[in-house]
């Protein structure tokens, strides 16, 4: 393990309660961790001037220099709020979206503490996807470059043996997806986190949405209770509240309000509030309403994207899928057919929301709401481009109320509900039900061709190996 250069002036360690005789409670327990009263960070009477430098936040010179070398000119809002509190030794709940600078908000305090008391397996960051895990690890290594910090990434899809060798080198920071971390805790000889000092759960709402809850419970049970914990999430759902109660001690909450996103005046936006079980039914109704127009249907997962493509084809719609698990040639083929209008419906994950050369379309349907407001804006930005008009309709079910309110908050306005005719919708029920059954068979055939990896999609569940795949 490389030597960490200790800081010249040691900061006095904060007083902490002794919890060494008890394990962390399960996040499934509603009455877990009784001493977890959440404290809101109260705004001051007069507005404070935003810190202009990282030094003003209490960071040492080496880390300030690292921020400068990384191109961080001034602290973002979440960094300005979270870093001083973290340096005081408090557990934190950070409500902030992707792109807010939250990675540095938790990485910098951990690195500063690491310089005081260098040790292996000092910090653990849990992330929902492989791509995010690598991004976080790169941030730690970049910010810790002047103090020789080493991190390792544990994610699915990679060789367990090479990861075990990396763990044997005793890195300071581990960035992992929950499934693969638990695999190593259970199977890698000599690997333990009993001396862990810092735990971060990044994008906690997505961790729970992706069914990592039971795995998180198992991980929390083997971590030392005497640690600092940071939980970052875009939303504060009931599941996240439960996870907070199980894992944090007297946390402070810091929230950064989203800026109001602007949309063009030629875009007609609305939402449709329906029971989750009727999503397919209302999708067919809307496609009939906009027949002949080009449409992108956005889904949250690869499985749902592929299933909807089969389902719509069975009903006679010219639908084609686009997602990250297609080969490059298949993705280019799908885009080519959509551009040429030989297929007028593109069913896609968020790979189609940004970065791809997709022409403007007539209609965007958010079949699944995205995890953050910025992605929502990118999605609906696929229509009403270059002065043209466009329509964007978002599906909201009983499970999406908080997410939808957050999106409306980011937009800065309430959107109208789309006036669906329920009687006309229900007329389609028999045909839709038949197509759903046939689509299940189509998915089974598709999975058999894909092999054992695909069979996991057929059941709608993923093993630990696949749970952390980027949804796009």
Curated annotation (Swiss-Prot):
Positions with a binding annotation for ATP: 96-103
Keyword Ion transport belongs to the record: no
Cited function: ATP-dependent rRNA helicase required for pre-ribosomal RNA processing. Involved in the maturation of the 35S-pre-rRNA and to its cleavage to mature 18S rRNA.
Motif (DEAD box): 202-205
Disulfide linkage: none
Similarity comment text for this entry: Belongs to the DEAD box helicase family. DDX47/RRP3 subfamily.
UniProt superkingdom: Eukaryota
Comp. bias intervals (Basic and acidic residues): 10-24
Entry-linked InterPro entries: DDX47/Rrp3_DEADc, DEAD/DEAH_box_helicase_dom, DEAD_box_RNA_helicase, Helicase_ATP-bd, Helicase_C-like, P-loop_NTPase, RNA-helicase_DEAD-box_CS, RNA_helicase_DEAD_Q_motif
GO cellular component, as recorded: cytosol; nucleus
Location of the Helicase C-terminal domain: 282-426
Disordered: annotated segments: 1-52, 443-472
Protein name as catalogued: ATP-dependent rRNA helicase rrp3
Primary location group: nucleus
GO BP term, example: rRNA processing
Keyword annotations: ATP-binding, Helicase, Hydrolase, Nucleotide-binding, Nucleus, Ribosome biogenesis, RNA-binding, rRNA processing
């Amino acid at each position: 393990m490389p030597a960490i250069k200790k800081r010249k002036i040691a900061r006095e360690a904060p007083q902490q309660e002794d919890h060494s005789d008890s394990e962390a409670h399960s996040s499934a327990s509603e009455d877990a961790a009784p001493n977890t009263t959440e404290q809101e960070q109260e705004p001051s009477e007069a507005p404070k001037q935003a810190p202009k430098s990282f030094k003003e936040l209490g960071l040492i010179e080496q880390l300030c220099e690292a921020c400068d070398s990384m191109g961080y000119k001034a602290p973002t809002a979440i960094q300005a709020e979270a870093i001083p509190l973290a340096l005081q030794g408090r557990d934190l709940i950070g409500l902030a979206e992707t792109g807010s600078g939250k990675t540095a908000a938790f990485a910098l305090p951990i690195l500063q503490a690491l310089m005081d008391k260098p040790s292996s397996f000092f910090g653990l960051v849990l992330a929902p996807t492989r791509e995010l895990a690598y991004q976080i690890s790169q941030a730690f290594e970049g910010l810790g470059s002047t103090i020789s910090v080493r991190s390792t990434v544990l994610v699915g899809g990679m060789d367990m043996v090479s990861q075990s060798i990396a763990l044997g080198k005793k890195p300071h920071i581990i960035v992992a997806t929950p499934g693969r971390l638990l695999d190593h805790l259970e199977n890698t000889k000599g690997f333990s986190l009993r001396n862990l000092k810092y735990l971060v759960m990044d994008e906690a709402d997505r961790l729970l949405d992706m069914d990592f809850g039971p795995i998180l419970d198992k991980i929390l049970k083997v971590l030392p209770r005497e640690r600092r914990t940071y939980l970052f999430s875009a939303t504060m759902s009931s599941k996240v509240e439960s996870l907070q109660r199980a894992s944090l001690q007297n946390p402070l909450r810091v929230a950064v309000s989203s800026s109001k996103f602007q949309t063009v005046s030629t875009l007609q936006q609305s939402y449709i509030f329906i029971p989750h079980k009727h999503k397919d039914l209302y999708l067919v109704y809307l496609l009939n309403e906009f027949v002949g127009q080009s449409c992108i249907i956005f889904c949250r997962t690869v499985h749902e994207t592929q299933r909807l493509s089969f389902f719509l084809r069975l009903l006679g719609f010219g639908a084609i899928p686009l997602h990250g698990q297609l080969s490059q040639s298949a993705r280019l083929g799908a885009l080519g057919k959509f551009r040429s209008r030989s297929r007028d419906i593109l069913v896609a994950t968020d790979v189609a929301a940004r970065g791809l050369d997709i022409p403007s379309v007539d209609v965007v349907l958010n079949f699944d709401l995205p995890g953050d407001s910025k992605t929502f804006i990118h999605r609906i930005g696929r229509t009403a481009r270059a002065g043209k008009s466009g329509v964007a309709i978002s599906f909201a079910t009983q499970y999406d109320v908080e997410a939808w309110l957050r999106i409306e908050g980011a937009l800065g306005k309430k959107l109208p509900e789309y006036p669906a005719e329920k009687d006309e919708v229900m007329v389609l029920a028999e045909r839709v039900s038949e197509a759903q059954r046939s689509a299940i068979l189509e998915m089974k055939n598709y999975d058999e061709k894909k092999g054992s990896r695909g069979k996991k999609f057929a059941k709608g569940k993923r093993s630990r190996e696949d749970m952390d795949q980027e949804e796009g």
